[in-house]
Amino acid sequence: MESDSGTVMVRVMEIKDGSTKTKEIIMEMPVRDGFLKWEGSGCLLAAVFERYGKGQAVGYGLVTGDCHKRGAVATSYAHDCHNILVAGANPADMKLALNRVIEMQGGMVAADGGRIQAELPLPVGGILSDRPAKEVGAGLARVREAMTGLGYRHYNPIMSFCTLTLPASPALKLTDKGLIDVKACKIVPLKVEGQRTQP
């Protein structure tokens, strides 16, 4: 953030059970020493990393609602471009989950408290498994159970999470290029311009 202190208004993706659509909400968040103080705000920090060697772009956003409340989840199965998505309540678990996805050459990971809670390797293009269907199904069930244990309250937490990056689905989604206002078909900044409170 260009502001050293005070508060800023930011765009947040709100997840609701029953849909893979998100709602854009505007929240006030503190800034300290030029950094957005999102931890403890009720929001997760989300990041999308370009993984095809085309500039190594990273997009950042915030997520709230019926998503997980602790730990972090990371995946390379993230519609439609299938870059790497990670979202978490703290940087340490985000780093752990993200690095594990990279180590597996793709997949889904849930982490909490500095430990991997569940994982599903997807080494074929980062979206497919080379293991028997029964084994994949069991791994997927463990990831889903772990996400629910971290507080995800959605009838299909995996599909909900993996479509946070789908810019064809309303209303606010995240890509490696940044936040996408789907209705307006444009990239929008995290900070809502023209709305800032004083220190």
Role assignments for model-derived ranges:
Residues V8, V12-I15, I25-I26, I84, ...:
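Weak global preference for isoleucine
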Residues M1, P132, I180-D181:
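Short, solvent-exposed coil/turn linker segments
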Residues G34, E39-L172, E193-Q198:
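Feature captures the catalytic cores and cofactor-binding loops of soluble hydro-lyases/lyases
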Residues M1-L44, T165-D176:
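Hard-cation-handling environments
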Residues L174, L179-P199:
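Charge-biased, low-complexity intrinsically disordered regions
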